């Protein structure tokens, strides 16, 4: 791609020529930094200067005096504008030249002008300049040395043309170069260079010349710096003569690939179709570079940005009918290969990572396709319900949005996109509240031990000398043990009676104390001769692990220090805990075998109901991988493998290859739990003797909880039976309510949904017919305005917006050629519906516009809205103001027609 002078104006050529221009002026060409910045305060690399920020801030010494780069950047703050405007992107390249205490303002301006007009050949008469209002030096250089006429140099305020790293630190004025797409318009109306249809900023020069202190005072920098940025996509648009950045050779090939896979032509497409193709082109570039830099799809941080962008690509592709080349599977990898092919001159690592990128895209797309199909149908019903509830200002509740997210995995941003397209608002605040409430419910309720109690228990341990002896590996009952200490309300007591909540220390116990992710045992402590009983709800370690402390309620009798007791763990609870704990070990091994040896534990919870396992993984397991994990665990359960547990030196355990538990600290002697051929871990928890005792294993859910951290929740043993019984009960209850066999439930529900939709449509049609009938009765109330026009302004309560529209249309048809109709409806809830319909004759005769008249009426009713000159709809929140508002509307119309 070359211009009239034979110069390369392709995206690659523009990039190469920029770098070579500054290399010829003694700038060191440096590589682009990663999209994952070293600066912990920034999520993604958003500017070319970011890799040099420590130098500009005086935190690092410069390695070179001057530099030039092409920096890959990602910004998502304007994601909703992608494809809408000519130049908004998520991914873009920023060409830059930098000076670290070397050259300054005069050279930076001269070179910016030279590369723009000489190297790139831009028409000097079409370049406009902005400077900071107080930067007389830059103004003079542009005017006197470069020769820019004063009427093409604009002084801007601090908000537009002054850069600062923060409230304190380096700062300085900016100067920007703008390209004029329409010089024929002259200088009028261009005072602020803010007409996006005419001007585009393509080069920004930052002159870091001051440092601001905490009092806001600015002093000159000892070493002045230059930071510049030229948008590659913008310069390509200018040089290639394209109407927008998307049609340059940097993005258009990606768009054309998507269009071809959808069987359409971009050039022949309507605006809505072009918008979706632009989103695909832009977002595909972004996700390719992000994944290449190690950012994988997840629900947190940078990973969520990748997931969000990719899901927008998938949804746009589905709406356009984009198909994979082979007609099946994921389509995103094929489009990504085009973007990857365009990447080499910007970042060669993208091409090297092509297989990784395509694998991630395919995995994520296929997972999301299932979610999208299920969620779209449910969301459609929710949006229809929202419109039925309030047609004037329909809003999807936060609870519904959260249900879509929590139950069906439908992300909020996609919900918002779909709702916006349907004209429905989303209660985002309500969604966040529902999310917070769910987190509160799921958070483990653990009461922190008061510091004073901890000190007291430490003193008790010192007094007793011997630590609590744990006997729970071999038995769930220990007879003849003694009560060594009693605590009540944080204080040591000699005895406690029925109803008291106490903490009990025994000299020996079968109760497992919480640790290694496993909860403490529950059970009971019985006094000798059955003189009393304590119900144990938990057991924990205290005093540096020397004491086992039992949390109890005295249910019968009186217990005192020195009493002989029998401690018994609940056999049912222990059985569940053992099954879940051993299943956790099997789960980790299955994950390593299925996903890879790089999988490592990041946390766990084993209780009596279920197990939770957190693990590090670069990406989410696929449904097929989870199915294999589940199958492996159940296979080992079926193999009836005997477990062994042995204490040994930690050095020997490491030699044997035992895996350590996450977050645990170990002494010189450790306990190793071995499932031969499957798993070997350092673990102090309780386990089954044979895998067959687990009974069964079922994954309940898998999700992301942090960047690169996944969570699996599952049940085993009796928990599987509980799950099956619960689901069986639900199925039977549904079958009973629907009066069909269980296997016919799905079909019956689908039929009922279709019946409901049909009934709703019929009801809507009847409401429309009723409104038209009411309107016929109102026709006689029309008044004759000057000029022969008919004016009818009336109230029709109890009518929804759709029916109100039908009524207005029928009245216009019935009353003649020159008609103005305004109808209002007030409900018991205080809300107002409004509609206006003006014929063309009324519009011309009175200069009336339905949207303007109705907008004022709606405003008087505490609402808003509008429409076209001939037809408009609106709503309000104050039905008490409706009568007066309608009278004002009538007066406005009649007065206009009287002129």
Swiss-Prot record:
<feature type="binding site">
    <location>
        <position position="585"/>
    </location>
    <ligand>
        <name>Zn(2+)</name>
    </ligand>
</feature>
<dbReference type="InterPro" id="IPR009000">
    <property type="entry name" value="Transl_B-barrel_sf"/>
</dbReference>
<keyword id="KW-0067">ATP-binding</keyword>
<keyword id="KW-0479">Metal-binding</keyword>
<keyword id="KW-0496">Mitochondrion</keyword>
<dbReference type="InterPro" id="IPR027522">
    <property type="entry name" value="Ala_tRNA_synth_plant"/>
</dbReference>
<keyword id="KW-0150">Chloroplast</keyword>
<keyword id="KW-0694">RNA-binding</keyword>
<dbReference type="Pfam" id="PF02272">
    <property type="entry name" value="DHHA1"/>
</dbReference>
<dbReference type="GO" id="GO:0008270">
    <property type="term" value="F:zinc ion binding"/>
</dbReference>
<dbReference type="GO" id="GO:0005739">
    <property type="term" value="C:mitochondrion"/>
</dbReference>
<comment type="subunit">
    <text>Monomer.</text>
</comment>
<dbReference type="GO" id="GO:0000049">
    <property type="term" value="F:tRNA binding"/>
</dbReference>
<dbReference type="InterPro" id="IPR018165">
    <property type="entry name" value="Ala-tRNA-synth_IIc_core"/>
</dbReference>
<dbReference type="InterPro" id="IPR018162">
    <property type="entry name" value="Ala-tRNA-ligase_IIc_anticod-bd"/>
</dbReference>
<keyword id="KW-0648">Protein biosynthesis</keyword>
<feature type="binding site">
    <location>
        <position position="581"/>
    </location>
    <ligand>
        <name>Zn(2+)</name>
    </ligand>
</feature>
<dbReference type="InterPro" id="IPR045864">
    <property type="entry name" value="aa-tRNA-synth_II/BPL/LPL"/>
</dbReference>
<keyword id="KW-0547">Nucleotide-binding</keyword>
<dbReference type="Pfam" id="PF01411">
    <property type="entry name" value="tRNA-synt_2c"/>
</dbReference>
<keyword id="KW-0809">Transit peptide</keyword>
<dbReference type="InterPro" id="IPR012947">
    <property type="entry name" value="tRNA_SAD"/>
</dbReference>
<protein>
    <recommendedName>
        <fullName>Alanine--tRNA ligase, chloroplastic/mitochondrial</fullName>
        <ecNumber>6.1.1.7</ecNumber>
    </recommendedName>
</protein>
<feature type="binding site">
    <location>
        <position position="687"/>
    </location>
    <ligand>
        <name>Zn(2+)</name>
    </ligand>
</feature>
<dbReference type="GO" id="GO:0009507">
    <property type="term" value="C:chloroplast"/>
</dbReference>
<feature type="binding site">
    <location>
        <position position="683"/>
    </location>
    <ligand>
        <name>Zn(2+)</name>
    </ligand>
</feature>
<dbReference type="InterPro" id="IPR018164">
    <property type="entry name" value="Ala-tRNA-synth_IIc_N"/>
</dbReference>
<keyword id="KW-0820">tRNA-binding</keyword>
<keyword id="KW-0934">Plastid</keyword>
<dbReference type="GO" id="GO:0005829">
    <property type="term" value="C:cytosol"/>
</dbReference>
<comment type="function">
    <text>Catalyzes the attachment of alanine to tRNA(Ala) in a two-step reaction: alanine is first activated by ATP to form Ala-AMP and then transferred to the acceptor end of tRNA(Ala). Also edits incorrectly charged tRNA(Ala) via its editing domain.</text>
</comment>
<keyword id="KW-0030">Aminoacyl-tRNA synthetase</keyword>
<keyword id="KW-0862">Zinc</keyword>
<dbReference type="GO" id="GO:0002161">
    <property type="term" value="F:aminoacyl-tRNA deacylase activity"/>
</dbReference>
<dbReference type="InterPro" id="IPR023033">
    <property type="entry name" value="Ala_tRNA_ligase_euk/bac"/>
</dbReference>
<comment type="similarity">
    <text>Belongs to the class-II aminoacyl-tRNA synthetase family.</text>
</comment>
<dbReference type="InterPro" id="IPR002318">
    <property type="entry name" value="Ala-tRNA-lgiase_IIc"/>
</dbReference>
<dbReference type="InterPro" id="IPR003156">
    <property type="entry name" value="DHHA1_dom"/>
</dbReference>
<dbReference type="GO" id="GO:0004813">
    <property type="term" value="F:alanine-tRNA ligase activity"/>
</dbReference>
<dbReference type="Pfam" id="PF07973">
    <property type="entry name" value="tRNA_SAD"/>
</dbReference>
<dbReference type="GO" id="GO:0006419">
    <property type="term" value="P:alanyl-tRNA aminoacylation"/>
</dbReference>
<keyword id="KW-0436">Ligase</keyword>
């Amino acid at each position: 791609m070359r211009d009239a002078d034979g110069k390369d104006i392709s995206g690659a050529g523009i990039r190469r020529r920029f770098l070579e221009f500054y290399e010829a002026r003694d700038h060191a060409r440096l590589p682009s930094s990663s999209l994952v910045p070293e600066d912990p305060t920034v999520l993604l690399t958003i500017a070319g200067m970011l890799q040099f920020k420590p130098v500009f801030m005086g935190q690092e010494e410069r390695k070179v005096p001057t530099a030039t780069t092409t920096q890959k950047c990602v910004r998502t703050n304007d994601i909703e504008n992608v494809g809408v405007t000519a130049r908004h992107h998520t991914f873009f390249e920023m060409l830059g030249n930098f000076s670290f205490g070397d050259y300054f303002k005069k050279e930076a301006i001269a070179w910016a002008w030279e590369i723009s007009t000489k190297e790139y050949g831009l028409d000097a008469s079409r370049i406009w300049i902005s400077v900071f209002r107080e930067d007389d030096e830059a103004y003079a250089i542009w005017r006197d040395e470069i020769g820019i006429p004063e009427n093409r140099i604009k002084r801007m305020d601090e908000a537009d043309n002054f850069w600062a790293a923060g409230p304190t630190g380096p700062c300085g004025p900016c100067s920007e170069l703008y390209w004029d797409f329409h010089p024929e318009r002259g200088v009028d109306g261009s005072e602020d260079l803010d007409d996006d249809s005419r001007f585009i900023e393509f080069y920004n020069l930052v002159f870091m010349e001051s440092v601001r202190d905490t009092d806001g005072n600015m002093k000159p920098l000892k070493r002045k710096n230059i930071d510049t940025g030229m948008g590659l996509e913008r310069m390509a648009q200018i040089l290639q003569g394209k109407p927008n950045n998307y049609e340059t050779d940097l993005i258009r090939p990606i768009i054309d690939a998507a269009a071809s896979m959808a069987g359409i032509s971009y050039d022949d497409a309507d605006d809505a179709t072009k918008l979706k193709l632009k989103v695909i082109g832009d977002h595909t570039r972004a996700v390719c570079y992000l994944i290449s830099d190690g950012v994988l799809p997840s629900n947190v941080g940078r990973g969520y940005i990748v997931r969000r962008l990719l899901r927008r690509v998938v949804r746009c592709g589905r709406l356009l009918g984009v198909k994979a080349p082979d007609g099946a599977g994921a389509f995103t990898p094929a489009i990504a290969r085009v973007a990857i092919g365009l990447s080499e001159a910007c970042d060669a690592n993208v091409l090297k990572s092509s297989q990784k990128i395509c694998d991630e895209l395919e995995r994520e797309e296929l997972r999301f396709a299932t979610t999208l199909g299920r969620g779209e149908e449910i969301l459609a019903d929710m949006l229809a319900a929202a419109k039925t509830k309030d047609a004037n200002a329909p809003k999807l509740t936060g609870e519904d949005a959260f249900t879509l997210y929590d139950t069906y995995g439908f992300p909020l941003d996609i919900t918002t996109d779909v709702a916006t397209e349907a004209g429905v608002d989303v209660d985002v605040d309500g969604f966040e509240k529902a999310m917070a409430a769910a987190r509160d419910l799921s958070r483990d309720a653990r009461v922190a031990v008061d510091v004073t109690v901890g000190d007291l228990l430490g003193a008790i341990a010192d007094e007793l000398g011997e630590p609590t002896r744990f006997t729970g590996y071999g038995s769930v009952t220990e007879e003849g043990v003694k009560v060594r200490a009693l605590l009540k309300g944080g204080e040591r007591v000699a005895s406690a009676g029925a109803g008291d909540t106490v903490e009990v220390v025994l000299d020996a116990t079968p109760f497992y104390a919480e640790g290694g992710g496993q909860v403490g045992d529950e059970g009971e402590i019985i006094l000798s001769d059955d003189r009393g009983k304590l119900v144990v709800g938990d057991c924990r370690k205290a005093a540096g692990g020397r004491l086992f402390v039992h949390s109890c309620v005295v249910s019968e009798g009186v217990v005192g220090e020195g009493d002989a007791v029998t401690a018994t763990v609940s056999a049912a609870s222990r059985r569940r805990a053992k099954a879940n704990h051993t299943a956790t070990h099997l789960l980790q091994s299955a994950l390593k075998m299925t996903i890879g040896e790089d999988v490592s534990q990041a946390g766990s919870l084993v209780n009596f109901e279920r197990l939770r396992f957190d693990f590090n993984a670069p990406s989410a397991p696929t449904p097929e991988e989870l199915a294999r994990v589940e199958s492996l665990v159940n296979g080992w359960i079926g193999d009836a493998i005997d477990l062994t547990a042995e204490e040994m030196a930690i050095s020997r355990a490491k030699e044997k290859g035992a895996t350590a538990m996450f977050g645990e600290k170990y002494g010189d002697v450790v306990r190793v739990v071995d499932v031969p051929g499957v798993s070997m871990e350092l673990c102090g928890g309780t386990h089954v003797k044979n895998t067959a005792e687990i009974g069964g294993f079922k994954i309940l859910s898998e999700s992301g909880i942090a960047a690169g951290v996944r969570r699996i929740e599952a049940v085993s043993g009796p928990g599987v039976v509980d799950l099956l019984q619960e689901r069986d009960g639900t199925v039977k209850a549904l079958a009973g309510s629907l009066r069909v066999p269980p296997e016919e439930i799905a079909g019956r529900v689908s039929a009922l949904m279709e019946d409901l939709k049909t009934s709703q449509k019929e009801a809507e049609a009847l409401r429309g017919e009723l409104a038209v009938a009411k309107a016929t009765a109102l026709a006689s109330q029309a008044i004759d305005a000057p000029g022969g026009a008919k004016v009818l302004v009336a109230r029709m309560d109890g009518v929804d917006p759709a029916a109100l529209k039908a009524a207005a249309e029928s009245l216009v048809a019935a009353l003649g050629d020159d008609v103005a109709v305004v109808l209002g409806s007030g409900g018991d809830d205080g809300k107002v519906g409004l509609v206006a319909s003006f014929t063309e004759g009324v519009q011309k005769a009175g200069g009336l516009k339905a949207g303007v008249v109705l907008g004022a009426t709606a405003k008087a009713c505490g609402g808003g809205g509008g429409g076209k000159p001939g037809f408009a709809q609106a709503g309000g929140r104050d039905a008490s103001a409706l009568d007066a508002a309608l009278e004002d509307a009538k007066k406005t119309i009649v007065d206009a027609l009287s002129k």
